[in-house]
Amino acid sequence: VGFKAGVKEYKLTYYTPEYETKDTDILAAFRVTPQPGVPPEEAGAAVAAESSTGTWTTVWTDGLTSLDRYKGRCYNIEPVPGETDQYICYVAYPLDLFEEGSVTNMFTSIVGNVFGFKALRALRLEDLRIPPAYIKTFQGPPHGIQVERDKLNKYGRPLLGCTIKPKLGLSAKNYGRACYECLRGGLDFTKDDENVNSQPFMRWRDRFLFCAEAIYKSQAETGEIKGHYLNATAGTCEEMIKRAVFARELGVPIVMHDYLTGGFTANTSLAHYCRDNGLLLHIHRAMHAVIDRQKNHGMHFRVLAKALRLSGGDHIHAGTVVGKLEGERDITLGFVDLLRDDFVEKDRSRGIYFTQDWVSLPGVIPVASGGIHVWHMPALTEIFGDDSVLQFGGGTLGHPWGNAPGAVANRVAVEACVQARNEGRDLAAEGNAIIREASKWSPELAAACEVWKELKFEFQAVDTLD
């Protein structure tokens, strides 16, 4: 009765340019590169179909449900400027397609099988609009920016961090010693590298103990609250939570997770534990470039950043704009706003395809890390502002006099930049002069300035705005 077997074009069902999006729809912007001979309407409709209710042929069970209620719809297609065969296809998904509070389920639908679809040469998810109705089903960050500042009693400046190097091979005691030197020199945080988990040369429990000792000793000496991102990432969720429990028992303020390699289910579980037990959660994005670096295939980091804000994390690495790792300024500032702000307007010049309302979900502090040193401090302070963590690994530990003087140099530099900014000086124009002035009364900063005066990482960004 009305069931007609066979294959029909996707666009007959899933391309609906007259559709008016609802406030409750999840909206997606895909960069679609169709195979030669496939019209953009068919390609866009195929994406909508394969990431929602469709399959390659008509099935009789379609008659048992309301397709109009549940299908994804490609409602707009724009050619990409300067490209002959690329299109931005906008797809609207009804909210009922997704399990509440599950980033895992959201991604399984939207970026699941469709990425292997033969009719497409390449496919990239550029942005998502998450509706308030769906956001409200997530806890989000365990604490958020304001609560973190209150817990740490640190206001009015960027926070300073340092990744302990060499990233692998140190014993737990030597590792703790390196943390202590950095913290007593003036840093707020030290950090486990993302691949430090629990290896034969340094088991996790030993590391946690010696790092806790470093935290308490440096706090006693400086009168400031200190932290070390203890990486709780593990082979199973149960083991990860066990490590977080031990961190809580030690009384340290913050733990860490590699959210892409660990997975969103594990990350959300850890974020819930952290909120329930007063731990801050630092998130590392190891593996992100596998997904987000190619311009025409994969998923843009702004989508991974939004997903993290839903899943939960208090800090996330967000590129530097000035260091050794990929990140164009306008694009980076676009997703930094999406991490921190309550409401972000659509702004294609910064890669933001949709207006996003976060309806009181706490913000995430962006972490700038990777190939940065004291000469970058004015630019970083200007670009990222106060609600950020500036992380100098080699830029602290590479100081010719050792870790503590390296930490002193960074602390003096950031305090000088904040003071200059507060006095109304232009950090972009006067940055080098500000650092030079400060180095006159800080021999540690002067030595750091000398070591890194010529160093630059200058390559063209791969992922640029159209």
From Swiss-Prot:
The modification N6,N6,N6-trimethyllysine is found at residue 4. Transmembrane segments: none annotated. InterPro entries: RuBisCO, RuBisCo_large_chain_AS, RuBisCO_lsu_C, RuBisCO_lsu_C_sf, RuBisCO_lsu_fd_N, RuBisCO_lsu_N_sf, RuBisCO_lsuI. Its main location: plastid. Keywords: Calvin cycle, Carbon dioxide fixation, Chloroplast, Disulfide bond, Lyase, Magnesium, Metal-binding, Methylation, Monooxygenase, Oxidoreductase, Photorespiration, Photosynthesis, Plastid. The record marks 324 as: Transition state stabilizer. One of its GO terms (molecular function) is monooxygenase activity. GO terms for biological process: photorespiration; reductive pentose-phosphate cycle. Substrate binds at residues 113, 163, 167, 285, 317, 369. Belongs to the RuBisCO large chain family. Type I subfamily. The basic functional RuBisCO is composed of a large chain homodimer in a 'head-to-tail' conformation. In form I RuBisCO this homodimer is arranged in a barrel-like tetramer with the small subunits forming a tetrameric 'cap' on each end of the 'barrel'. RuBisCO catalyzes two reactions: the carboxylation of D-ribulose 1,5-bisphosphate, the primary event in carbon dioxide fixation, as well as the oxidative fragmentation of the pentose substrate in the photorespiration process. Both reactions occur simultaneously and in competition at the same active site. This is Ribulose bisphosphate carboxylase large chain. It comes from Aphelandra sinclairiana.
